[in-house]
Amino acid sequence: LVKPPYSYIALITMAILQSPKKRLTLSEICEFISGRFPYYREKFPAWQNSIRHNLSLNDCFVKIPREPGNPGKGNYWTLDPESADMFDNGSFLRRRKRFKR
């Protein structure tokens, strides 16, 4: 299997953008990636820490705590509204600029 040409930031962004509420948990992001890209299905779960690391490290991702009464594990992650133009012309292959909050 060939590794997809996308960065982890691009993969996370794709996952969040396709979700109805534009927010996902770490496990939902990983489910999207492994469901969409067979390469990551084979390598699971070695890359999950890389996803976690990128969520925490990059300002374009914002952590949203779970609402009280919403059971489940982990916080939600969404995109900072200011980072919408992070990818050139909607192409996930090339990031336009590093986003800083």
From Swiss-Prot:
The keyword Disulfide bond does not apply. One of its GO terms (biological process) is negative regulation of DNA-templated transcription. One of its GO terms (cellular component) is nucleus. Keywords: Developmental protein, DNA-binding, Nucleus, Transcription, Transcription regulation. Residues 3-97 bind DNA. Its main location: nucleus. InterPro entries: Fork_head_dom, FOX_domain-containing, TF_fork_head_CS_1, TF_fork_head_CS_2, WH-like_DNA-bd_sf, WH_DNA-bd_sf. It is found in: Nucleus. It comes from the Eukaryota. PROSITE patterns: FORK_HEAD_1, FORK_HEAD_2, FORK_HEAD_3. One of its GO terms (molecular function) is sequence-specific DNA binding. Transcription factor involved in regulation of gene expression in a variety of processes including formation of positional identity in the developing retina, regionalization of the optic chiasm, morphogenesis of the kidney, and neuralization of ectodermal cells. Involved in transcriptional activation of PGF and C3 genes. PANTHER family: FORKHEAD BOX PROTEIN, FORKHEAD BOX PROTEIN D4-LIKE 1. This is Forkhead box protein D1. It comes from Rattus norvegicus (Rat). The lineage of its organism: Eukaryota, Metazoa, Chordata, Craniata, Vertebrata.
